[in-house]
């Protein structure tokens, strides 16, 4: 399972560098374009887009994972530095969930408990929203399969993007639970979601929020509990994440659950002046 997450072991002689591998793995625009194309062709109510005949042509999720990291990127990743795109442990036994949450740009995501994902009740209704649902779920849970056929490039991209979409839709539910909020609390305390850019909020820690609960409607924003306004994330990588993976409810329910974490509103507002005189505000 993801034996090549550390950047080697699948390529044989000379494996690609970690940044090169991830440059291809997180090329969301290319992958999402492929998924959009597929969603237009298929019925949105279909939970599994393969017939029994089609299933024989699709390999196991473990094969998909190997190809995900062994495939060379079409273009170089757009990075600000030459540092690694992944933080934390990169051992061979890293789960897909840990690997995904540690990708550059995915810092807003917390790790969803596998027990939560394995409970069918928590996934109610998602099979009709995500194409290749069963394969995407197997990929997330690192489930091995005896099917040894190979993905086509298009099928590989579909399952890869479907797994990201499915995890996001599970994530938005999980962060409304007690365990999910506790995980997000740690990130909030560590300023993982960023600080409010407003001067008079004095670097207030923010929370992720979506402007819509419908997937692919808008990207994630950050909500400042002090000035109660929303802003674009500072990182362009985080700015590409679907806002539906965090939803419109989370920050407000979070602050109700942790009332002691809600800051007082700023006492000062900026006042425009010209040569020291306040500018008259015409109504």
From Swiss-Prot:
Compositional bias (Gly residues): 7-16
GO biological process: circadian rhythm; photoperiodism, flowering; positive regulation of circadian rhythm
Pfam families tied to this protein: CK_II_beta
GO cellular component, one term: protein kinase CK2 complex
UniProt feature coiled coil, ranges: none
Annotated keywords: Cytoplasm, Phosphoprotein
Record region (Disordered): 1-23, 35-92
Post-translational modification summary for this protein: Phosphorylated by alpha subunit.
Keyword Cytoplasm among record annotations: yes
Compartment(s): Cytoplasm, Cytosol
A GO term, aspect molecular function: protein serine/threonine kinase activity
Superkingdom of the organism of origin: Eukaryota
Biased composition (Polar residues): 58-70
UniProt entry tagged with the keyword Cytoplasm: yes
InterPro entries: Casein_kin_II_reg-sub_N (IPR016149), Casein_kinase_II_beta-like (IPR035991), Casein_kinase_II_reg-sub (IPR000704)
Complex and partners: Heterotetramer of two catalytic alpha subunits and two regulatory beta subunits.
Summary of the function given for this chain in its UniProt record: Plays a complex role in regulating the basal catalytic activity of the alpha subunit. The tetrameric holoenzyme CK2, composed of two alpha and two beta subunits, phosphorylates the transcription factor PIF1 after an exposure to light, resulting in a proteasome-dependent degradation of PIF1 and promotion of photomorphogenesis. CK2 phosphorylates translation initiation factors. May participate in the regulation of the initiation of translation.
Family under the similarity heading: Belongs to the casein kinase 2 subunit beta family.
Name this polypeptide is given: Putative casein kinase II subunit beta-4
Organism of this sequence: Arabidopsis thaliana (Mouse-ear cress)
Lineage per the UniProt record: Eukaryota, Viridiplantae, Streptophyta, Embryophyta, Tracheophyta
GN (gene name): CKB4
